[in-house]
């Protein structure tokens, strides 16, 4: 679904603390070029508890969904991404 080399580069680009930019990351892994169904498939992989949503606790570990040896997001990075993705303010990101 996503190119392994693109994922490796994207994870490497945000290896430093506080360097994660969700827009840049998703562009680098190729999600911006995927259709809605393909994006939904990736979302389902990242939705670890299969609730249909990505909650803040899952979001903290989102990079590990792409690469097992990736770092966790900081609280600041997690909150920034949640604010960008949580369109209705319920503390979750839907597909």
From Swiss-Prot:
Residues given in the record as Ca(2+) 1 binding sites: 47, 49, 51, 53, 55, 58
Domain (EF-hand) ranges: 34-69, 73-95
Keywords: Calcium, Metal-binding, Muscle protein, Phosphoprotein, Repeat
Molecular function GO labels: calcium ion binding
Binding site for Ca(2+) 2: 86, 88, 90, 92
Residues with PTM Phosphoserine: 19
Family matches, as InterPro entries: EF-hand-dom_pair, EF_Hand_1_Ca_BS, EF_hand_dom, Parvalbumin
Keyword hit for Metal-binding: yes
Cysteine disulfide partners in this protein: none
One GO term describing the cellular component: cytoplasm
Domain characteristics, as noted in the entry: AB domain, comprising of helices A and B, is involved in structural stabilization, protecting the hydrophobic core of the protein. It is required for high-affinity binding of Ca(2+) and for Mg(2+)-binding.
Known role: In muscle, parvalbumin is thought to be involved in relaxation after contraction. It binds two calcium ions.
Protein family: Belongs to the parvalbumin family.
Name of the protein described by the UniProt record: Parvalbumin alpha
